[in-house]
Swiss-Prot record:
Glycans are attached at residues 54, 183, 341, 375, 520. SUPFAM superfamilies: Leukotriene A4 hydrolase N-terminal domain, Metalloproteases ('zincins'), catalytic domain. GO terms for cellular component: cytoplasm; extracellular space; membrane. It comes from Caenorhabditis elegans. The keyword Signal applies. Keywords: Glycoprotein, Signal. The lineage of its organism: Eukaryota, Metazoa, Ecdysozoa, Nematoda, Chromadorea. Residues 63-113 are annotated as: Disordered. Residues 63-94 have a biased composition (Low complexity). Residues 1-27 form the signal peptide. The keyword Glycoprotein applies. It holds the Pfam family Peptidase_M1_N. This is Matrix non-peptidase homolog 1.
Length: 781
């Protein structure tokens, strides 16, 4: 009997089973291939399972919109905590980086860095700037630290002696401070009254018989029983025979002469500062104004001497150990972290600082305030420290202040990159306080509360940027010439704003604002530079900023950045001179000596007209320059014409530069130079035609005529020859018609051509009639 044929349903089922079996086999083969590939991939150390903890390089993960988890807490002195998440564009590293940061603080070994791998875009990945090894940089200070430790153990013995017949004096510049152990007690916040005692370790740089310290209105110093001097080299206690004050110096007369190179310890007990004025800020809560009580320092040059006796010169750096007795209701911050092993309730003692000048010492005591705290992270490859923000208000809306952290982080990342020197501390304190102007001391930034309240104001962001720059340009490297320091900070702020567009302005725009309309006058120095009128007897001129613009525009946009890198490589935690910066300028420009001369001459004491003014006479085959000022300057200038642009260096009183052009010739056509250039009458007449000509090598002819007005007011122009009077009147008539100059300059231009439409009687009588150039022109009908 034949079996019946299989049913159609069973055939279909067998087909599906066969297909499934084939699919499983193919899947197994594919899985085996993937596993084999991943195994080989990981052996090369490039796969996602790479052992980051044992890697020889720090792996980077770059994201266009990375989420940084940031803990926002009250400081250790307050119990409550809140947490917020902040979205930032940042370059993050793995946890291995955080571990390397901790290791760098405990070891002097350097941290291996990686070169960023270029992305598929045209922009290269950011340069990696790792935390600096502070211990390695300060290794040459080890001997000083040993001197302090040994000398601190020497007991000062009671000694007696008779005063000399005539008072003896010395000078603070004959000493180099090594270390301060400073204890300050806040006796009264309202006045304020500060009491203190200190140990000062210093070495002599010359033979002396008196120790001279800066001290202004500090009481209890006249009692010599409160002062002891120890010779650290011999262990001997040196008798202080007399203490007397002359002007801003307290002189401690010694019973014996001390030779150069001797290490001394000066103990001063119970001094009182009751007149610290603008050098210490305070905030007192009232029934209507419920704010945290605060008191803190905002030291400008010569401020420290109002609070404690000190060597208060700009080139006298030393380390500090500060203890602040503020009472149990308050907390405190300073340049360095609190030392928990020494601090107690009501007394905050801080770790030893890196070397600082006296004006860089900073402390703030406060109560009942709400801080914001941000953990260590990175941005664009740069290390960012912990950032602790303290406010003078009991604010509850944390997010309204997050922009401060965002801007600070961006500027710190850029400063790390430009200087090649990462922020050297583990924490930055930012204090919003009732102060007149911003202040920067290494580790502490103090911001004016009134400015921070108005985030949309341009000056608010300018202040913040300058104070962050000050962490590097004043804190890490100090320059003896304070005006150089302030001017460089102002210029770097302009460059940073061009880069980050925090404030929409350009360097060219800012230089144009401060370029004088009268060579005998300058712009508002307080607006441009970071300084306080009430605290500065000699304000710095804004003209000091211009030289950096000249360097960048003449020799390349990386010139000033190159100078900064050279200085930070050589002078971190020490003081640089103008000569050091001049040498750095020469190095940054590839060995051009005129760049160094530019720095030297720009910061030398000058006559009334403190910039180069040159008269250019254009002929068919050359341009002849005559310097019109008393001083001779070295001036790099571009000469532009039909054949192109040529860079010339003018270094003599009278100098001819070969130059041929078939049409117009313009010196400094791009307005790059800090120098003023005036011309002969024939050249000005040609420049009038150049004014609207597309072939003109300069688009800023108006500025050239404006400079003529400034030179006219300064009475520096040579008297015109009789045959040129008509030409000059044509030039001045053009200036008046085009309204190129304004104010007194416009009046004197009109006076020269007898068309005084806008002139006041006093301008004519007091200024215009006394200008030699005008006397000649006005005398001719």
């Amino acid at each position: 009997m034949t079996p019946p044929p299989a049913s159609p349903s069973k055939k279909a089922k067998s087909s599906w089973l066969l297909i499934a079996l084939i699919a499983v086999i193919i899947g197994i083969i594919l899985c085996a291939g993937v596993i084999t590939f991943l195994t080989l991939f990981n052996k090369n150390g490039d796969g996602p399972d790479m052992d980051w903890q044992n890697a020889t390089e720090v792996p980077l993960t770059t994201t266009s919109k990375a989420t940084v988890s940031t803990t926002t807490t009250q400081s250790a002195t307050t119990p409550s905590t809140t947490t917020t998440r902040i979205e930032e564009t940042t370059t993050t590293t793995s946890g291995a980086f955080d571990e390397s940061v901790k290791n760098s603080e405990a070891s002097t070994s350097t941290i291996p860095t990686t070169e960023a791998v270029p992305t598929t875009t045209a922009t290269d990945a950011p340069e990696i700037v790792m935390p600096v090894d502070v211990a390695s940089i300060l290794k040459d200070k080890t001997k000083d630290f040993e001197i302090v430790e040994k000398c601190a153990e020497i007991q000062a013995l009671p000694v007696s002696c008779t005063p000399s017949q005539s008072p003896l004096t010395s000078d603070p510049s004959k000493f180099q401070p090594i270390h301060y152990v400073l204890n300050i007690t806040i006796r009264d916040v309202r006045k304020p009254v500060l009491e203190g005692h200190m140990q000062l370790f210093a070495s002599t740089k010359d033979q002396v018989q008196a120790i001279s310290l800066h001290s202004v209105k500090i009481h209890n110093l006249e009692n010599r029983d409160r002062i002891h001097v120890v010779n650290c080299n011999t262990g001997e206690t040196i008798c202080v025979s007399r203490v007397h004050q002359i002007d801003d110096l307290i002189h401690l007369e010694l019973a014996q002469s001390i030779s150069s190179g001797v290490n001394l310890r000066v103990d001063i007990d119970g001094f009182i500062s009751a007149d610290s004025g603008p050098h210490v800020f305070k905030q007192i809560p009232t029934a209507k104004w419920r704010v945290p009580q605060m008191i803190g320092s905002v030291f400008e040059p010569t401020s420290a001497r109002h609070v404690f006796p000190s060597f208060d010169l700009h080139n006298q750096k030393s380390t500090f150990n500060l203890c602040l007795n503020h009472g149990p209701s308050m907390s405190a911050i300073a340049n360095s972290l609190i030392n928990p092993n020494v601090s107690t309730s009501g007394i905050s003692c801080f770790e030893k600082t890196v070397p600082l000048i006296a004006q860089q010492l900073s402390f703030v005591a406060f109560e009942k305030t709400n801080p914001l705290f941000y953990n260590t992270t990175t941005m664009d490859g740069a290390y960012l420290p912990e950032i602790d923000m303290i406010f003078n208000l009991n604010a509850k809306n944390f997010k309204q202040y997050e922009w401060i952290h965002s801007e600070v982080s961006k500027v710190m990342a850029l400063m790390s990159k430009w200087s090649g020197f990462s922020y050297p501390l583990t924490r930055l304190e930012i204090v919003v306080a009732p102060v007149q102007a911003g202040h920067s001391a290494l580790g502490v930034i103090t911001l004016p509360a009134q400015a921070i309240a108005y985030q949309k104001h341009t000056s608010t962001h300018e202040t913040l940027i300058k104070e962050v720059i000050g962490q590097w340009m004043e804190g890490v490297v100090t320059t003896e010439h304070t005006c150089f320091e302030k001017a460089l900070i102002a210029y770097v702020e302009w460059k940073i704003n061009e880069e980050l567009q925090i404030v929409k302005k350009t360097r060219k725009m800012e230089v144009s604002k401060i370029r004088p309309r009268n060579l005998n006058e300058t712009a508002d120095s307080v607006r441009v530079l970071r300084q306080i009128k009430s605290q500065s007897s000699n304000l710095c001129s804004p003209r000091f900023v211009e030289v950096f613009y000249t360097l960048d525009e003449t020799y390349g946009q990386e010139t000033v950045i190159g100078m900064i890198r050279v200085i930070f490589d050589k002078f971190a935690f020490s003081t640089a001179t103008i000569s050091d910066w001049a040498s750095a300028a020469e190095t940054a420009t590839g060995g051009r000596p005129e760049a160094g001369a530019l720095i030297h001459q720009w910061y030398r004491p000058s006559s009334t007209i403190s910039r180069p003014v040159l008269r250019a006479v254009v002929s068919s085959n050359s341009v002849e320059f005559n310097q019109l000022t008393e001083e001779t300057w070295t001036v790099p200038l571009e000469i532009s014409g039909s054949a192109g642009t040529q860079l010339a260096v003018i270094s003599e009183k009278k100098q001819a530069i070969p130059f041929v052009s078939s049409d117009y010739v313009v010196v400094d056509a791009g307005r790059k130079s800090h120098a003023f250039v005036v011309y002969d009458a024939d050249t000005y007449l040609r420049l009038i035609r150049c004014f609207g000509d597309s072939r003109c090598p300069s688009k800023e002819i108006g500025g050239i005529f404006s400079d003529l007005g400034a030179a006219l007011l300064a009475n520096i122009l040579p008297k015109p020859e009789n045959q040129d009077v008509a030409k000059w009147k044509s030039v001045f008539k053009f200036m008046a018609q085009q309204n190129i100059v304004e104010g007194t300059a416009a009046c004197c231009v009109e006076h020269a051509i007898r068309e005084m439409r806008k002139c006041s009687y006093w301008d004519i009588q007091d200024v215009c009639t006394k200008i030699d150039f005008n006397i000649v022109l006005a005398a001719v009908a």
